[in-house]
Amino acid sequence: MTSVLFVCLGNICRSVAAEAVFTQCVAARNLQADFRADSAGLIDYHEGELADNRMRRAAAERGLTLTHRSRPVTSADFSRFDLIVAMDEANVRGLESRRPQGNATPIVRLADYLTAHASPTIPDPYYGTEADFHHVLDLLFDACPNLLDELLEK
């Protein structure tokens, strides 16, 4: 089973939605026995909280239910997951600074899997408008199937 961890800053907007979109892609291909997804944040400020209400509403409009509760990245995550997927460069740097010595778990940027959108990152919608949350979902629905395709090729 391939395990994937999606990471953003607080684990209440982007990473929790990416986890849900990726899980939906896996289920649509009947691959639940082959993949496991989770999400976490670089900070613990929102630990135990559900996703931001605005993201939950936007996700619900696309058929997603976000039930994950925020949790921080732990050092154990680097050995528990086969791949860690960051939403932006700051997330990559934060993950690299937490990486246990000797760990080689790949860290990739989800935006690198975009094909229908040109964006260097999955931008944080937290201080934005409702439209920003929908834009993030557009990006996630673009990138996650491509990420899954690449994992299936390995």
Residue ranges, per PLM feature:
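Conserved active-site segments centered on acidic
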Residues: M1-R80, D149-K154
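Helix N-cap/beta->alpha junction signal
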Residues: S15, D88-E89
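Phosphate-binding/catalytic loops
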Residues: L83, E89-K154
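Hydrophobic beta-strand core positions in alpha/beta domains
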Residues: F6, V85-A86
